């Protein structure tokens, strides 16, 4: 990683947003005559929208920010974030939006960490770097029966990044069990083949209020 004062030759910043989902240079703020005339998009029930897309170059997704008009448990679990790297037909990330940002019980609360944050519990920020060699696509699927009226977001990434042989792809996996089975292990991570790094996990537990309200 270069120091802040060192020139990054051949690396260019891109910013995908509601008005410029492909992150093209000079293509944002076009809907309102040079102003932010399309600050949000709507996601209809049972539909999928592409939030960011890049082809024909290497790069690194460096930051994602989102906030929604509907922060209900149903919407946070029903919106599904999907990330595809290098043309793969299977998403490397395929998780409910709320769980991806560590809001696993459907409640939004303030969160501050080096990888994820939710300032004041009103928005979601993701700082984990997600590299790609040839292409990337980030989709959001609404699996609920309700329309999401407003989704505000931006995706910051760079293109032209030199990526060595030791580059790792970012993956995220989701598992939900209701109810858990006594004396049966809950699977946190399925069997993984190959090498990688385990960055961490978020677990949300809703206890049996009648039996364990004084324990949890």
Where are these regions (language model features)?
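Beta-strand-centric surfaces of beta-sandwich/beta-rich domains
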Residues: 1-216
